[in-house]
């Protein structure tokens, strides 16, 4: 199913399509992707949709939308697990032929009694059909794995270290249900083997499954992949991540204005790091990442750190791309925008992106440029427009109109020269000028504000405010 890679390393991300792509799942996908890239291997995606009742097309779409946004794409055809049911059944029959599986006709009532007895004796459940002659094949029954009754199963986990499980405590898990449907632990082993997966990197809530899956590998005489069980992500308070901690789905982080490269950087830092390096590129992460360096303790979601990291990547991002993202975000707010909103944002982004942590903040910083004339002036600004200040701003208006260029550097020179020629400090006209140009909205330094507005818009706003009032 999977072509050999130069190093032979194959990782996979195997989500269940029962909901959105959780931030924890996204980090698991990223770690698999990083390790595959680091080793020159392959990163594969398999949708574990054997639970047909809970799996939905909407969830599949949401998962891939999140992965696409993060830039994590499979290096091969995406596998949908339910389509491989015949292969899963084939392996179960091989296990039956090897004497490593058996048919079980236990009723629900018998199963409950057996559970209570096993619990009292401190062992896993064992079916009376384990070594009994087969019953009526036409009667409903399941097929169970026939695990060893003594000894231990060792899982050499790349993150947790060696973990041993007493076989007496591992139950004879069901491989095929009474309706013929394969179970999770069986399907995972068969698919990972057939896909050539060499490294199973997943959340540590799957650690107990590793022992059961190891026994199935061994029963089939298949090579056991390397396991790496990474810690879960907790909220800032150390509790399990939940809705009360804010966003959980990757799509929610996108809606909040985070950008993919910032999110990848932050997710990589959740449980892994490279010295004191906090902000880094994908290329650096690929070069440095090793799953063996992932820490054992749960990682905590830190909004301040996420904002800091995202801000660094936002500043380095292409202005045209940021303009498109900011315009799209502004349009979703439902507020009327000027016809030339794209051009206004394009002029403003270079002047304000240094102070923004997210795309939503970038839109806020562009708000002054998106106002339409005439601007409604704040009461504070109206009071600042004394007769003396109005006359001074009229003189400044003429100098601005005559400026050879209307870029931030030129405008800084014009403002300084004007203050000197007037013999006053900037405070004598700057606050009123800012109010006239922005309508009280947040804005950068005045030279940058005017450059973002353009000569025509800045002069027009000045003319509106300085015109004689009725």
Swiss-Prot record:
One Pfam family in the UniProt entry: tRNA-synt_1c
Motif 'KMSKS' region, chain ranges: 240-244
Domain of life: Bacteria
Residue span of motif 'HIGH' region: 15-25
Binding-site residues for ATP, renumbered to this chain: 243
Keywords carried by this UniProt record: Aminoacyl-tRNA synthetase, ATP-binding, Cytoplasm, Ligase, Nucleotide-binding, Protein biosynthesis
Keyword Nucleotide-binding on entry: yes
E.C. number: 6.1.1.17
Subcellular location: Cytoplasm
Signal peptide: none
Catalytic activity: tRNA(Glu) + L-glutamate + ATP = L-glutamyl-tRNA(Glu) + AMP + diphosphate
PROSITE patterns associated with the record: AA_TRNA_LIGASE_I (PS00178)
Gene3D superfamilies: 1.10.10.350, HUPs
CC per GO annotation: cytosol
A GO term, aspect molecular function: glutamate-tRNA ligase activity
One Gene Ontology term from the biological process aspect of the record: glutamyl-tRNA aminoacylation
Job description of the protein: Catalyzes the attachment of glutamate to tRNA(Glu) in a two-step reaction: glutamate is first activated by ATP to form Glu-AMP and then transferred to the acceptor end of tRNA(Glu).
Summary of subunit composition and partner proteins: Monomer.
PANTHER family: GLUTAMATE--TRNA LIGASE (PTHR43311), GLUTAMATE--TRNA LIGASE, MITOCHONDRIAL-RELATED (PTHR43311:SF2)
Family, similarity comment: Belongs to the class-I aminoacyl-tRNA synthetase family. Glutamate--tRNA ligase type 1 subfamily.
Full protein name: Glutamate--tRNA ligase
Gene from which the chain derives: gltX
